[in-house]
């Protein structure tokens, strides 16, 4: 019996919500005490590129990528439930990081 911290990362907000709902549904079906999904701050990375390298210096283009994060904490999770949790089908495009907290 231990606490498990699951951190989800994705560039797509809808995809990360779908995966976090799957984890919540899993916890409710197995009667596991949990907290979350807790939305963590979204990291926004902006890149500015010159459109033309010579005369038109004022002409620039901006791109951004947003990394959405969620945190889910499961309490009193035994080894059998942890294995079942790891076997959950997760959409591609979502990074899942599982850590055990003592």
From Swiss-Prot:
Matches recorded under InterPro entries: Ribosomal_uS10, Ribosomal_uS10_CS, Ribosomal_uS10_dom, Ribosomal_uS10_dom_sf
Claim: Transferase is one of the keywords in the record: no
UniProtKB keywords: Ribonucleoprotein, Ribosomal protein
SUPFAM superfamilies: Ribosomal protein S10
Pfam families: Ribosomal_S10 (PF00338)
Gene Ontology CC, one term: ribosome
Gene Ontology biological process terms, A to Z: translation
Keyword Ligase: no
GO MF entry, a single one: structural constituent of ribosome
Record's subunit section: Part of the 30S ribosomal subunit.
Protein purpose: Involved in the binding of tRNA to the ribosomes.
Family to which this protein belongs: Belongs to the universal ribosomal protein uS10 family.
Protein name (Swiss-Prot/TrEMBL): Small ribosomal subunit protein uS10
Species assigned in the record: Mycoplasma mobile (strain ATCC 43663 / 163K / NCTC 11711)
Source organism phylogeny: Bacteria, Bacillati, Mycoplasmatota, Mycoplasmoidales, Metamycoplasmataceae
Gene: rpsJ
């Amino acid at each position: 019996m231990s606490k498990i911290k699951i951190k989800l990362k994705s560039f797509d907000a809808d995809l990360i919500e779908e995966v976090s709902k799957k984890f919540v549904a899993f916890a409710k079906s197995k009667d596991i005490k949990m907290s979350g999904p807790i939305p963590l701050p979204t990291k926004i990375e902006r890149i500015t590129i010159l459109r033309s390298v010579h005369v038109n210096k004022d002409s620039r283009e901006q791109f951004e990528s947003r990394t959405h994060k969620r945190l889910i904490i499961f309490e009193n999770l035994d080894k059998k439930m942890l294995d079942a949790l790891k076997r959950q089908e997760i959409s591609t495009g979502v990074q899942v990081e599982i850590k055990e907290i003592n």
